A protein has these predicted regions:
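Short acidic-hydrophobic, aromatic-tinged amphipathic segments that line or gate anion-handling sites
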Residues: 2-9
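Active-site cores that bind ATP or allylic diphosphates and position pyrophosphate for catalysis
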Residues: 108, 112-203
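Residue-level detector of anion-binding/catalytic polar loops
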Residues: 48, 87, 149
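Conserved beta-strand termini and adjacent loop/short-helix elements that scaffold enzyme active sites
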Residues: 6, 52-54, 92-94, 153-155, ...
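N-terminal Rossmann-like or analogous alpha/beta NTP/dinucleotide-binding catalytic cores
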Residues: 60-124, 128-146
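N-terminal catalytic cores of NTP/NDP-binding nucleotidyl/phosphoryl-transfer enzymes
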Residues: 11-73
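A short acidic, often aromatic-flanked loop/helix-cap motif at beta-alpha or helix-coil junctions
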Residues: 9-12, 96-99, 156-161
Length: 203
């Protein structure tokens, strides 16, 4: 899996793609279903399958310490995206410049010129661009103008509960590990590096 950081490196590494955009925090069952469908589209079109992430996540940029805790670190997210068959991950730096980027400019600069997207899978509630003025309808209009297909990635439910990173956080907050694991599609793990101390407790 190829990792591309920053706008300036995209065109050098990628000539065209099928794309989805999001946080993919937890890479849960809903994310996995989206990625399986995108993999099929990529194979049909004979194009690489790409995921665009933002660092920091938009909520972290706007809310700071009040933003929801992540379900996993970026390193672990990249591991699970690779396991899902993703060919390319683009990490866009979410800073003041990006936050103030007009929605139409994001479409033309990123989706059209840089990525040359042919198929875009996105939630119908996706908002983007300065003041969140960009939406699903604007992307559909752009697709007709610039020649790419836009598809609603839809929500997925398990036992009538919408699968989402928020639902998993709530399950963990309520000590309901079984529900969190069902929504994730695997056991919940906190991964980290072991730091060895001075071993003063040894006899």
């Amino acid at each position: 899996m190829q990792l591309i950081r920053g706008r300036s490196n995209v065109s050098q590494c990628l000539s065209s793609c099928v794309l989805t955009i999001g946080n993919f925090d937890g890479v849960h069952l809903g994310h996995q279903a989206i990625l399986r469908h995108l993999r099929q589209k990529a194979d049909e079109l004979n194009l690489p399958m790409a995921v665009m992430l933002f660092e920091p996540q938009p909520r972290e940029y706007f809310l700071g310490d009040k933003a929801p805790a992540r379900l996993m670190r970026l390193r672990d997210k990249l591991y699970y995206l690779k396991q899902a068959g993703v060919d390319v991950v683009i990490i866009a730096k979410f800073d003041r410049t990006f936050a103030n980027l007009p929605a139409q400019q994001f479409i033309e600069d990123w989706l059209v010129r840089k990525l040359n997207v042919k198929f875009l899978s996105i939630g119908d509630d996706f908002k983007f661009g300065a003041k969140r003025q960009g939406n699903f309808a604007l992307l559909q209009q752009a697709g007709e103008k610039f020649g790419f297909t836009v598809e609603d990635s839809r929500s997925f439910c398990l036992d009538e509960l919408r699968i989402s990173s928020t639902a998993i956080r709530e399950a963990l907050a309520n000590d309901d590990l079984k529900l969190a694991e069902k929504l994730l599609g695997r056991p919940y793990r906190i991964l980290g590096r072991v730091i060895h101390g001075n071993e003063l407790g040894r006899t």
